UniProtKB/Swiss-Prot annotation:
Protein name: Small ribosomal subunit protein uS13
Assembly behavior: Part of the 30S ribosomal subunit. Forms a loose heterodimer with protein S19. Forms two bridges to the 50S subunit in the 70S ribosome.
GO terms (BP aspect): translation
InterPro entries membership: Rbsml_uS13_C (IPR027437), Ribosomal_uS13 (IPR001892), Ribosomal_uS13-like_H2TH (IPR010979), Ribosomal_uS13_bac-type (IPR019980), Ribosomal_uS13_CS (IPR018269)
Organism: Francisella tularensis subsp. holarctica (strain LVS)
Length: 118
């Protein structure tokens, strides 16, 4: 298994698809990384040479991925909650943040229905 950014990349997948298993790298960024490293995106990870894997590692290291990105996102949400702005209050109450309706929808965000006790 190739290990890039602290993640074991599945060896039986194509390079582009394998890179997307890293948190913070989507399909477009994976294609850009392959193009920068001169790696064919359709080659499977197990067929890459050690130099190619090392070049992928150095290229991925230029981006904020995995734990650093997760920490950054959670700190951004925490900052919004500390400010007490509208978005922060919505996060704190576990309600939709981006203006969606909540009268009939938003069950995923609100959780299971709570019956009214008489």
């Amino acid at each position: 298994m190739a290990r890039i950014a602290g993640v074991n990349i599945p060896v039986h997948k194509h390079t582009v698809i394998g890179l997307t298993s890293i948190y913070g790298i989507g399909k477009t960024r994976a294609q850009q990384i392959c193009q920068t490293c001169n790696v064919d995106p359709t080659v499977k990870i197990k067929d890459l040479s050690e130099e190619q894997v090392e070049s992928l590692r150095t290229e991925v290291a230029k981006f904020t991925v995995e734990g650093d990105l997760r920490r950054e996102v959670s700190m951004d949400i925490k900052r919004l909650m500390d400010l007490g702005c509208f978005r922060g209050r919505r996060h704190r109450r576990s309600l939709p943040v981006r203006g969606q309706r909540t009268k009939t929808n938003a069950r995923t965000r609100k959780g299971p229905r709570k019956p009214i006790k008489a």
